[in-house]
Amino acid sequence: MRRRDFLIGAARGIGSGVVLGSLGQVAWADTGQDQCFVPWNSKTPMASWHKKKPPYRIALSNSYIGNEWRTEMVQIAKMYSEHKAVKPFIKDLKISSAGNDVNSQIAQVNQMILSGVDAIVMDAASPTGLNSTIDKAARAGVLVTSFDNVVTTKKAITINEDQYEMGKRWAEFVVKHTGGKGHVLMVRGVAGTFVDNKRYKGGKDIFDKHSGIKTTEVYGKWDNGTAQKVTADALASGGGFDAVWCEGGDSGVVRAFQQAGAKVPPIGGEAENGFRKLAAKEDFPILSIGQSPALSALSIKVAIQMLQGHKVPRSISVPLHPVTNKTLKEGKNYFPGVPDSFYAAINIPECGLNFDAQAVVNQKV
């Protein structure tokens, strides 16, 4: 199998319909591909791949399994691949995690190439560190789709939500609620990753326009326990904060304020279930925008679409779904019956990807 050149053209779906099952509503195929496969911008070219008959051998290369989001992402990938409407297209799904080490992930991907997989879906440890390995995969006839922490090589299809825009919107929310003045705690993610870099730049570009805003930065690693600790440390060191800008671990941030006996300030943050539950109960101002762990399922869907011979944008923009205090709805965007650490942004409705929260929790990794 050889890699074709990237071509300009129109994307088509694999099929049509919504499949109902134990996952809740899971649409395997076309729900209006103009809504799902949205080019990143007007200059994004279309991409194609050599058509191959299913079923396909697919591997998920995950750089890091150290927080709730990554676990949930893997759970959703497994659920999607095992669904009765998807299963005929997948011969095998192998999942490996690399401990957030670039060299380990390179070795992992090299092994996947040698094993003869048809496609690799990847959450990368570095935007650039795996580029040469992905180029090697392309030469070997292995399709690579990159999601969440995406890579920069043009040999991969990238699938992501706009991280810069997410960080920017959180900051705009903070500015609105502070009047552009005050002390803001910035709880960052995992240092050096694409997502952290882009979100941080989006936030700082807004904060730097307001001389009345002072920021303190900590790294919460998108993990509730870590975020709670670093927030508690910041509060203990004498930090009085007028607002929080948070990339993840928001429930931990709220708990840190509560345990310190401090008023929970406005928080622009991610989509942990506990964060939204607490906001619904206690009504502190929030803007919650979640990176969907269903990006893994969408990346598998894109890989199968391309292996079927269809074209997709080389860089796909997944819509953001902001939630405010006014739009919080039990059972829709937060779930009382599942853990606080659960990431509630599990659906990408534009792509027909709608999962049942309890089924995700119950899925074995």
Residues covered by each model-derived region:
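A residue-level marker of the well-folded mature domains of exported/periplasmic proteins
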Residues: F6-I8, G15-V19, W28-V365
